[in-house]
């Protein structure tokens, strides 16, 4: 598995971060279930940690959850390893800074929701 920092040079110094510990649980999205209210569960418990999807050794996305809701910064990568998007979630909804990159790693758009 790759460490998030080794996958790209996504700048996160000004992002609103949820302070999950560096050893927080990291699982495949297939391990989670979701209810109609968009709350995510692991073994019938509200999930706190990271959901990460890989293609081979390359991370495709990393989504933060806190108490079953997307909360904090979520990152997505193009299949070539370049950053694709960074979205900030608060209580399950996109809220805060976002950035979008093209397949060559060039910043296409950034803003705040």
Which residue ranges define each predicted feature?
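Glycine/tyrosine- and acidic-biased, solvent-exposed loop/turn segments at the edges of beta-strands
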Residues: 1-113
């Amino acid at each position: 598995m790759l460490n998030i920092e080794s996958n790209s040079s996504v700048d996160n110094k000004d992002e609103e971060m949820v302070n999950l510990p560096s050893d927080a649980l990291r699982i495949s999205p297939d391990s989670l279930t979701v209810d109609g209210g968009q709350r995510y569960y692991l073994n019938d418990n509200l999930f706190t940690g990271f959901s990460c999807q890989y293609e081979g050794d390359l991370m495709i996305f990393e989504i933060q959850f806190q108490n079953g809701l997307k909360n904090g910064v979520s990152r997505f990568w193009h299949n070539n390893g370049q950053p694709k998007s960074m979205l900030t979630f608060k209580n399950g909804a996109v809220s805060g800074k976002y950035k979008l990159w093209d397949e060559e790693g060039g910043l296409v758009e950034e803003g705040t929701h």
